[in-house]
Regions:
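N-terminal intrinsically disordered, cationic/polar leader segments
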Residues: 1-39, 45-87, 92-145
Length: 145
């Protein structure tokens, strides 16, 4: 992995076997970025997709592997009032299943790079976005206070 800052944005090149989400969080901590958005593309080999089930307040997980074309990666990083980091990441993958081209998408728990991933990390300027737990839904939301 390597990254550089140009202007207000960080440009990250991830390499084989890098885990995308944990790497983004590590860079945010190292650079003292408390809230940011990010996007990216790449070639991956492993992904854990989560779907939130409101009735149970838990996530269902699906694991996909193989040559996964990361067609779209979007997300954000925020902290809570205690400076604990959280991510909210969604991705879309295309892959082949026999002769069929398939897609998989959703909320991401982890993504492992096969060849490379190219990520743009955009810190929030002029303020901070925090995360606040919502007991009614059992999940966290942005807090601007």
């Amino acid at each position: 992995m390597d990254y550089r800052k140009f202007g207000e944005c960080y440009y990250i090149r991830m390499d084989r076997d890098d885990e995308i989400i944990s790497t983004i969080l590590e860079i945010c901590k190292k650079e003292n970025i408390k809230s940011a958005t990010f996007s990216g593309i790449g070639g991956c080999k492993d992904a854990e997709i989560q779907t939130f089930i409101p009735e149970t307040g838990s996530f269902e997980e699906q694991h996909i592997s193989g040559m996964l074309e990361l067609a779209s990666l979007n997300g954000n990083v925020v902290t809570d009032k205690n400076d604990v980091y959280y991510h909210h990441t969604h991705a879309v993958f295309s892959y082949k299943d026999g002769e069929k081209h398939c897609m998989a998408a959703g909320h991401m728990k982890s993504i492992t790079v096969l060849y490379t991933a190219e990520i743009e990390l955009r810190p929030v300027t002029g303020g901070a976005i925090h995360r606040k737990y919502d007991p009614e839904t059992g999940t966290g939301f942005w807090d601007f206070n």
